[in-house]
Amino acid sequence: MKRRMTRRRKKVCAFCADKNHKEIDYKDVNKLKRYVSERGKILPRRITGNCAKHQRALTVAVKRARHIALMPYTLD
């Protein structure tokens, strides 16, 4: 059996593509929930398509939101 070589398109960072965004805010829980799995883990760059700069800012924002109890640490 031969495997077909399919090239996947590189995902574009949603924060870089949106020129109107100012910064990633830890109080915007609805936006942060898109980057957290159903188990409560932060999704990696290769899945979300974020650039390194915005992935780091997103991680800090999620951790801050968890610390002040806006988001849960885990979901059971």
Curated annotation (Swiss-Prot):
<keyword id="KW-0699">rRNA-binding</keyword>
<keyword id="KW-0687">Ribonucleoprotein</keyword>
<dbReference type="InterPro" id="IPR001648">
    <property type="entry name" value="Ribosomal_bS18"/>
</dbReference>
<keyword id="KW-0694">RNA-binding</keyword>
<comment type="function">
    <text>Binds as a heterodimer with protein bS6 to the central domain of the 16S rRNA, where it helps stabilize the platform of the 30S subunit.</text>
</comment>
<dbReference type="GO" id="GO:0003735">
    <property type="term" value="F:structural constituent of ribosome"/>
</dbReference>
<dbReference type="Pfam" id="PF01084">
    <property type="entry name" value="Ribosomal_S18"/>
</dbReference>
<dbReference type="GO" id="GO:0006412">
    <property type="term" value="P:translation"/>
</dbReference>
<keyword id="KW-0689">Ribosomal protein</keyword>
<comment type="similarity">
    <text>Belongs to the bacterial ribosomal protein bS18 family.</text>
</comment>
<dbReference type="InterPro" id="IPR036870">
    <property type="entry name" value="Ribosomal_bS18_sf"/>
</dbReference>
<dbReference type="GO" id="GO:0022627">
    <property type="term" value="C:cytosolic small ribosomal subunit"/>
</dbReference>
<dbReference type="InterPro" id="IPR018275">
    <property type="entry name" value="Ribosomal_bS18_CS"/>
</dbReference>
<dbReference type="GO" id="GO:0070181">
    <property type="term" value="F:small ribosomal subunit rRNA binding"/>
</dbReference>
<comment type="subunit">
    <text>Part of the 30S ribosomal subunit. Forms a tight heterodimer with protein bS6.</text>
</comment>
<protein>
    <recommendedName>
        <fullName>Small ribosomal subunit protein bS18</fullName>
    </recommendedName>
</protein>
